[in-house]
Amino acid sequence: MAEQEPKELLEMSTDTERLLEENDLRPLWEVEKDFGNQFGGFEADIWKWEDIQASIDAIERDVPIADLPPGFQRRVAVPVNTGYRNAISNTIYVGVQTVSPGETAPAHRHGANALRFTIDGSEDMKTVVAGEEFPMRDNDLITTPQWEWHDHVNDGDETAAWLDVLDLPLVLDSLNARNTFENHELDRQPVTKSQGYWESQYGRARPFEDTKEDGIPGPFEGNCAATPPYRFSWKDTLQTLRQRAENDDPDPHDGYSLSYVNPATGQPPLFPTMSFRAQLLQEETDPHFHNAVDAYFVIEGEGATHVGDDVLEWSERDIFVIPPDEIHHHDPDGEAILLGMTDRPVFEAFNFYAEAEP
């Protein structure tokens, strides 16, 4: 007797197939093969800074912010992955935004969490969040948290540029949630707090009487601590990173790294959905893999990251992404510093994060 193929063993009668179809039902062995394929084709990818720079310069020449439609008054070039055409990954959005001298990117707020990592900044370039002006110096990281008013004001004489990083793909696509969004009635929100206010509420020294609101802002509920507006000075971050390199042993996979913490808790992740770290690499790292997405911005230096059979050769200001479950390691040419971005907190929230060496 000839051995039957699995498909023949699972073959249903025409009547059974019709019955299931009429009632919008499918057998498990047919639907399970469709799971996990929604974002098929997600690849390791890299965007070179010279290409990004040329693109944002061209957009700046062609499109004044004031000409953009309400709600989209942000001049941004968005890296899109080959296998996912809206963003760098299915959970993390990265964009490069510019504001010309004298321009304002008008105040708005949204349900997605966001941060700004300054590429070209100055004392006269400010992001205003929840009433405080935060100066945007090179490599400073500024949070613009969920449902907080924020606008970007360039009172200097040079174009400013920075990374926008949001959890928009996770919220809008993976979770299929509504994009809760609101424009402020003014282009520039009123500055109601002196510089340093939010640091005084959440920095090393805090008010004796804790009167700040700990609740999640806006029409949202949950169990995670809300992330406040905050500016992480690159001067302080780099100093601490150097201290680590002088006194500690490097992680075999990530080198010397510092996690940006939620100022309200003093612990990572910075947001419930995304975690960020500054990584100092001085030598080749050991290969590993994990089920979270890793995206990177090169702050200083050059080198290569090996992802499976691909080699991503990077230099200062390049952006690259590593898909889940791909074996990878970094190989800097001398010393390099990276900004690492990951959706690992999402997996950890479900006790589902996994990491291993090959």
UniProtKB/Swiss-Prot annotation:
Superkingdom of this protein's organism: Archaea
InterPro entries: Cupin_1, Cupin_2, GDO-like, RmlC-like_jellyroll, RmlC_Cupin_sf
A Pfam short name: Cupin_2
Main EC class the enzyme belongs to: oxidoreductase
Regulation: Inhibited by 2,2'-dipyridyl.
GO molecular function: gentisate 1,2-dioxygenase activity
Thermal dependence: Optimum temperature is 45 degrees Celsius.
Induction of the gene: Up-regulated in cells grown on benzoic acid, 3-hydroxybenzoic acid, phenylpropionic acid or cinnamic acid, but not in cell grown on pyruvic acid.
Protein name: Gentisate 1,2-dioxygenase
